[in-house]
Design a protein with these regions (language model features):
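Cyclic nucleotide-binding regulatory domains
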Residues: 1-35
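A small-molecule sensor/coupling module
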Residues: 25-27, 44-79
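Glycine-rich phosphate-binding P-loop
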Residues: 80-107, 117
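Conserved catalytic-core segment of NTP-binding enzymes
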Residues: 152, 160-237, 436
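Non-catalytic peripheral regions of patatin-like phospholipases
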Residues: 207-209, 213-252, 267, 317-361, ...
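Helix-rich "cap/lid" substructures immediately adjacent to catalytic or cofactor-binding pockets
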Residues: 248-298
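Catalytic nucleophile loop
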Residues: 272, 294-313
Length: 545
């Protein structure tokens, strides 16, 4: 038999837990991608330890709960729509359909096409025209009857201009599994009006429509929309130059995001909190860019939101490293103070410095305008629960998520008292499931914590121990909290990247470059295994060696 991967585990994880409930011994091969120390415990010894060591008992029950959650949670298999309708608000970028169809064909798909074009720019082995020989629209039932012979075709694309009367569009779109509506800023108003009219005639269309917004030239983010998101389930952005190419290297996979969505293989990355240690996320993202590892969805808590939202807005990770290093560098007056970098951070929170800094780069952009969908996590002290934000002001989403309790006053608005989301969900991988990700990678900068604190280690005699000051204590409390609470949001994670940033302080923003380098190192080490898992997800989309 050909061996296959049963499970991929990381630091502090276990396997074989369910073997406690039966005597049968099932052999399994274990391969490691790095040097590690493993502990093997026989079944009888494990049972005896349950009665002898309370901490072992608690940890085992916690691990069992997570294992049962995974066992009873259905595997995330993305939906592959068979009939895909592509609506165009302008003839100018009809070539987008050709690009998508040819890409699907390059992946081995047999694609049939129904189109209202008079030319033959859309090529497929099987095609039907919506126009008769006089150039008039054919009866939809007639077209449907002709297409009935395509029962074995795995993908059918309906390519049509959005200038038809609403009754005709409603009729031809009824059988569609998903609807991609392509438009730019010049056609957004008429597109919005038509989509609302279509959704009134065909209410089920609200669950099928995804926006495809065309961004031109140097346009970094999409224009704001008023109400269109209420009638759609997805929102793609493509930087388009008219020839199927993207204009910005950091967002060049706009078309590929649509392809992955159609194939049910969307990739999500969850960026965890960790204050300055979160600068490691930028190193991770830089390697993903260089190696062509796709990102379809992003979520982030605290530092994950601070780094992830600007990246989702199209800023290059290398530029962000330099910008954070400069923008968060303490001024000279703090250099002569004990723990001056900590006092600088407190002043930045209490003096409103974060808002000014963020809006210099994010302006008044909203999360809906960003190239990559982003969900930030904050905590509401009124309801004592998480708040997930996928829309609204981008800078405010960061401010809410990084708002450290005790350092900065809570943000009070709309019946909520908002503080740093890390107190409830420090690595929000679970958020990505509801966003539609079928493969989820967590980036955890709090996983590794050194056993040295304020000059003390586990072997330091009592009479030689140092008493930590307030800043050291607050920082260590947060690091310990982040490390232990991280598992709450990572139960749905398929893979984890853990940069070792334990040598850096939580206020070490001026060392962003060195911290980011740890993200680079961890991601380079993780790449072979990550590629292997992506290939298992979709061998055609991810043909990695």
């Amino acid at each position: 038999d050909v061996p296959h991967i049963i499970q991929v585990i990381g630091r502090s994880n276990q396997f074989g837990l369910l073997g406690l409930f039966h005597d049968d011994q099932n052999p399994v091969n274990v391969d490691t991608t790095q040097n590690l120390t493993g502990l093997a415990i026989k079944r009888q010894d494990a049972i005896e330890l349950l009665n002898q060591v309370p901490r072992w008992h608690r940890n085992l029950l916690g691990a069992l709960g997570m294992r049962l959650h995974q066992a009873f949670t259905p595997k995330r298999i993305g939906h592959r729509p068979r009939l895909v309708a592509i609506l165009h608000a302008s003839e100018e970028y009809r070539h987008l359909s050709t690009t998508l169809i040819r890409r699907l064909q390059s992946l081995g798909e047999d694609v049939a096409v129904i189109s209202d074009r008079e030319d033959t720019r859309v090529t497929a082995k099987r095609s039907i025209s919506l126009l008769d020989k006089h150039g008039n629209l054919r009866n939809p039932n007639e077209v449907r009857s002709e297409a009935s012979s395509w029962a074995t075709i795995e993908r059918c694309v309906l390519d049509i201009q959005l200038d038809k009367n609403i009754e005709y569009l409603n009729e031809v779109l009824q059988d569609s599994d998903t609807i991609l509506c392509c438009f730019d800023s010049n056609t957004s108003q008429e597109t919005e009006s038509l989509l609302f009219e279509l959704s009134e005639c065909h209410p089920a269309a609200r669950k099928k429509i995804s926006l495809v917004r065309i961004l031109r030239g140097t346009q970094q983010v999409a224009d704001p929309l008023k109400n269109m998101h209420s009638i759609c389930r997805g929102d793609f952005k493509i930087h388009w130059d008219g020839f199927g190419q993207s204009c910005h290297t950091t967002r060049k996979s706009g078309i590929e995001r649509i392809i992955r969505n159609l194939r049910g293989s969307s990739i999500g990355f969850a960026l965890g909190g960790g204050a300055a240690r979160g600068m490691a996320h930028l190193g991770v993202l830089s390697v993903l860019d260089e190696e062509g590892i796709p990102i379809d969805f992003l979520s982030g808590t605290s530092a994950g939101a601070l780094t992830g939202i600007p990246y989702a807005a199209g800023y290059d990770s290398t530029w962000l490293i330099e910008t954070f290093s400069q923008d968060l560098k303490p001024s000279k007056r703090y250099k002569f103070l004990p723990y001056g970098d900590a006092w600088y951070m407190i002043g930045k929170f209490r003096g409103g410095g974060w808002d000014d800094m963020l809006r210099t780069h994010l302006f008044d952009w909203t999360l809906e305008q960003l190239s990559i969908p982003f969900t930030s996590v904050t905590a509401d002290l009124v309801a004592a629960e998480q708040v997930h934000r996928s829309g609204g002001d981008a800078a405010s989403a960061i401010l809410e998520s990084i708002n450290l309790p005790g350092v900065s006053p809570p943000i009070c608005q709309n019946g909520r008292v908002l503080v740093d989301g890390g107190i409830l969900n420090n690595v929000p991988a679970d958020v990505l499931v509801t966003q539609g990700a079928t493969f989820i990678v967590a980036v955890d900068v709090a996983a590794k914590i050194g056993h040295m604190f304020a000059g003390n280690d586990p072997t330091t005699p009592t009479d030689q121990m140092n008493t930590p000051n307030m800043f050291q204590t607050l920082g260590r409390v947060r690091a310990a909290q982040d490390r232990n609470i991280r598992k709450m949001g990572t139960q749905d994670t398929d893979f984890t990247i853990e940069p070792d940033v334990s040598a850096f302080q939580l206020t070490d923003f001026q060392n962003a470059s060195a911290i980011a380098q740890q993200g680079v190192i961890a991601t380079r080490e993780a790449l072979p295994q990550l590629r292997k898992l992506l290939k298992q997800l979709d061998p055609e989309l991810f043909p990695y060696a």
